[in-house]
UniProtKB/Swiss-Prot annotation:
UniProt-recorded name of the protein: Ribosomal protein L11 methyltransferase
Catalytic activity reported: L-lysyl-[protein] + 3 S-adenosyl-L-methionine = N(6),N(6),N(6)-trimethyl-L-lysyl-[protein] + 3 S-adenosyl-L-homocysteine + 3 H(+)
Cross-referenced InterPro entries: Ribosomal_L11_MeTrfase_PrmA, Ribosomal_PrmA_MeTrfase, SAM-dependent_MTases_sf
Gene3D superfamilies in UniProt: Vaccinia Virus protein VP39
Family matches, as CDD domains: AdoMet_MTases
Lineage, top ranks: Bacteria, Pseudomonadati, Rhodothermota, Rhodothermia, Rhodothermales
Entry EC number(s): 2.1.1.-
Subcellular location: Cytoplasm
Domain of life: Bacteria
Protein task: Methylates ribosomal protein L11.
GO molecular function: protein-lysine N-methyltransferase activity
GO cellular component term of the entry, any: cytoplasm
GO biological process: methylation
Keyword S-adenosyl-L-methionine attributed: yes
Length: 280
């Protein structure tokens, strides 16, 4: 048993408190009009309070809304093929390889992404928000760092719209392998480099845009290192955050001398892009 899938059959308007409760143990979520799915690694399962989840669901009128099942690594492709379809995010269309390519009449930049055990498909609001804010900020020739790259979707997207080079880093070796496969699928091996590790493995240079779509706790822990990787005038893009966490994150980033430049919200989630002063 590698991962546990929790399915909460509740409408989107009721997702927020459960997202907050499962934010730390879960490594990813899938939301749609009828349910919320959370994916928790087996080693984090002890942090999930099933009794509290069931009590809260019952209090909200959903006593039978929770189902739990273990997932083996080999089952993930079937899981995603059953649930994924092309998703538009800003100028991008994120499309799994199990789905036929879109019509040539669509002017979107197509990203062919298969997630396997990683997250970052465009089916979660945090990825869509990050893709939109990235597209608005990226300039041709930029150097991009994607921390917690997952599927590699942000690094790949950056190269597809003009970045000179993008580096994705992730502490999960399965994510690193998956991201490298997606880089090959999108024919971006000359532009995207994927490495195992955290932001420290990218300490040899500075970047024009640093992106991190991870949890609030990890973002706060990594904040000094993320800011240190920014070139003068660069942008810091943070996603993976619930709306109530906005002010805490904004204040933490401001303490490093960066100002909120743009923000977006969707389905209870928030993302912000911060600008570093052009002067050292």
């Amino acid at each position: 048993m590698d991962t546990i899938e929790l399915t909460l059959t509740i409408p989107p308007v009721e997702h927020a408190p459960f997202l907050a409760e499962l934010e730390e143990p879960a490594t990813g979520f899938v939301q749609n009009d009828t349910e919320l799915r959370a994916y928790v690694p087996a080693e984090r399962w002890a942090a999930v309070d099933q009794k509290q989840l069931k009590a809260r669901l019952a209090a909200d009128g959903h006593p039978d809304a929770l189902s739990i099942r273990p997932l083996e690594s080999k089952n993930w492709n079937a899981v995603w093929e059953d649930t994924l379809s092309p998703v538009r995010a800003g100028p991008f269309l994120v499309c799994p390889t199990s789905v036929a390519p879109p019509s040539a009449r669509d002017d979107a930049t197509v990203l062919r992404i298969d997630p396997e055990m990683s997250f970052g498909t465009g089916h979660h609001a945090t990825t869509r928000l990050a893709l939109r804010l990235l597209a608005e900020a990226l300039a041709p020739g930029d150097r991009v760092l994607d921390v917690g790259t997952g599927t590699g979707v942000l690094a790949i997207a950056a190269c597809r719209i003009g970045a000179d080079a993008a580096r994705g880093v992730d502490t999960n070796p399965d994510a690193v392998r998956n991201a490298r496969e997606n880089v090959r699928r999108n024919e971006e091996t000359d532009c995207v480099t994927v490495q195992e590790g955290s932001v420290d493995v990218a300490s040899d240079t500075q970047y024009d845009l640093v992106a991190a779509n991870i949890t609030r706790r990890v973002l706060l822990e990594l904040m000094p290192a993320l800011v240190a990787r920014l070139a003068p005038g660069a942008s810091l893009l943070l996603s993976g955050l619930l709306r109530p966490q906005r002010d805490d994150i904004r204040d933490a980033v401001a303490s490093h001398g960066l100002a909120l430049d743009a923000e977006a919200a969707e389905e209870g989630w928030w993302a912000g892009r911060f600008a570093r002063s052009p002067s050292p």
